[in-house]
């Protein structure tokens, strides 16, 4: 028996999950899927809350959805109320694991989290998957990124760089290992996470809100994200995107993909693939191009 830990970060989904695929095909016989919640009172070095109430509630909805999906596949998500540097080494030791697989994130705080795990003796395999286009396919070294977006876009278009085909959701997972109750208690977790108190979204919404995340259509889960993408395309809203995208209030002036992209409940490559299919079926115009343009803008910044 061998176990690999999969650490969910800003990738709270099962569709188009190269990092999860890497864990499932690592040769391990068992999989322990883990997410670590930041403490409610955690502060940045500048004294601000690291995660605000609205983001915490929206992310919690994503986690509830992920719980349901993974439980249906026979391997419930382990939600820990302890930082990764505390929780993951304890869990790894308890189940005899030496390797953690996770999403690669190019940010100092997140890189420091990975460094702490390696310093604790764990092997950490990181997989880049958050952008539309992989940095490795760019026609320049990472340290020679064009200084302005327009140059970046033009070079990408001239080079004909296209996103990878998004991966399908797994239809099965490796079985979970047994984790001693004492270890679960030490990392503030219960397998299946039924007793973890996740913040609830607000009930109802202000009619002026451009993203009322307390309503079913704006739920934080992967299922809601994919349903939103499907209805957005079914209503042919990409054709009018460029004309309406700079509105300030209401639900339908822009794509509203950003909140789900931020938590990773929606993959940019899935958006691109579905948008390309939409263009084949209904035609391309400035609006559909501008949606792709904005995904590329997200990559650059």
Residue ranges of predicted features:
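Trp/Phe/Arg-rich N-terminal binding region typifying the photolyase-homology
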Residues: 1-169
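Glycine/tryptophan-enriched, flexible segments
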Residues: 143-301
């Amino acid at each position: 028996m061998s176990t690999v830990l999969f650490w969910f970060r800003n990738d709270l989904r099962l569709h188009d999950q190269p990092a999860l695929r890497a864990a499932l095909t690592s040769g391990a016989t068992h999989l322990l899927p883990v997410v670590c919640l930041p403490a409610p009172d955690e502060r940045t070095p500048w004294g601000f809350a690291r995660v605000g109430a609205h983001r915490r509630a929206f992310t919690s909805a994503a986690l509830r959805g992920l719980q349901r999906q993974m439980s249906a596949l026979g391997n419930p998500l382990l939600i820990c109320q302890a930082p990764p540097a505390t929780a993951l080494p304890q869990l790894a030791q308890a189940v005899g694991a030496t390797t953690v697989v996770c999403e690669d994130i190019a940010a100092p705080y997140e890189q420091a989290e990975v460094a702490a795990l390696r310093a604790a003796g764990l092997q950490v395999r990181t997989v880049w998957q958050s952008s539309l286009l992989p940095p490795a396919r760019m026609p320049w070294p990472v340290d020679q990124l064009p200084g302005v977006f327009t140059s970046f876009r033009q070079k990408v278009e001239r080079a004909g760089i296209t996103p990878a085909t998004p991966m399908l959701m797994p239809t099965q997972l490796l079985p979970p290992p047994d984790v001693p109750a004492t270890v679960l208690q030490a990392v503030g977790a219960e397998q299946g996470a039924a007793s973890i108190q996740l913040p609830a979204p607000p009930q109802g919404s202000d009619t002026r809100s451009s993203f009322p995340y307390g309503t079913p259509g704006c739920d934080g889960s992967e299922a809601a994200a994919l349903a939103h993408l499907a209805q957005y395309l079914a209503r042919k809203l990409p054709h009018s995107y460029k004309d309406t995208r700079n509105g300030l209030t209401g639900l339908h002036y822009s794509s509203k993909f950003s909140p789900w992209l931020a938590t990773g409940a929606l993959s940019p490559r899935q958006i691109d693939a579905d948008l390309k299919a939409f263009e084949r079926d209904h035609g391309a115009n400035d609006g559909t191009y501008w949606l792709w343009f904005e995904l590329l803008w997200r990559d650059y910044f």
